[in-house]
Amino acid sequence: MDSNTITSFQDILQRMSKMQLESSSADLNGMITQFERLKIYRDSLGESVMRMGDLHSLQNRNATWRDELSQKFEEIRWLIAECRNILTKTENSFEQITFLQALQLLLEVESEIRTFSFQLI
């Protein structure tokens, strides 16, 4: 995985964990958890692509990997919508920068996951 992507994930997660949004902290914690799960999924998919021989074991171990992939895209769309929602409501520049960067990272990760998944098909 690209070291910039790792740093971006870590930076955004760290900044989000320090925030207190007007919405509930449960919403923010849910977003943080989703980001962490997305990072882990992206990493594992990327590793599978690098070891193309793992494609068959991936398919055998998880016959529903396409359903899982679809679910991850739904999660990405949900996170994008949440980031946009927060951006429309907040006037705090720290939050704006954080969520703009999170939005950019989500779009990059979505593109990477699409690329990985096409390589696995």
From Swiss-Prot:
On whether Cell cycle is a keyword of this UniProt record, the answer is no
Q: Where is the signal peptide?
A: none
Q: Where in the cell is it found?
A: Virion; Host nucleus
Q: Which GO terms describe its cellular component?
A: host cell nucleus; virion component
Q: Which SUPFAM superfamilies match?
A: Nonstructural protein ns2, Nep, M1-binding domain
Short motif Nuclear export signal, span: 12-21, 85-94
Keyword line: Host nucleus, Host-virus interaction, Transport, Virion
Can you supply a Gene Ontology BP term from the record?
exit of virus from host cell nucleus through nuclear pore
Query: What subunit structure does UniProt give?
Result: Interacts with protein M1. May interact with host nucleoporin RAB/HRB and exportin XPO1/CRM1.
Q: Tell me the HAMAP family matching this sequence.
A: INFV_NEP
Family according to the record: Belongs to the influenza viruses NEP family.
Q: What does this protein do?
A: Mediates the nuclear export of encapsidated genomic RNAs (ribonucleoproteins, RNPs). Acts as an adapter between viral RNPs complexes and the nuclear export machinery of the cell. Possesses no intrinsic RNA-binding activity, but includes a C-terminal M1-binding domain. This domain is believed to allow recognition of RNPs bound to the protein M1.
Q: What else is known?
A: Average number present in a viral particle is estimated to be 130-200 molecules.
Would you tell me the protein name for this molecule?
Answer: Nuclear export protein
According to its UniProt entry, this protein's organism is Influenza A virus (strain A/Pintail/Alberta/121/1979 H7N8)
| Lineage, highest ranks first | Viruses, Riboviria, Orthornavirae, Negarnaviricota, Polyploviricotina
The gene designation is: NS
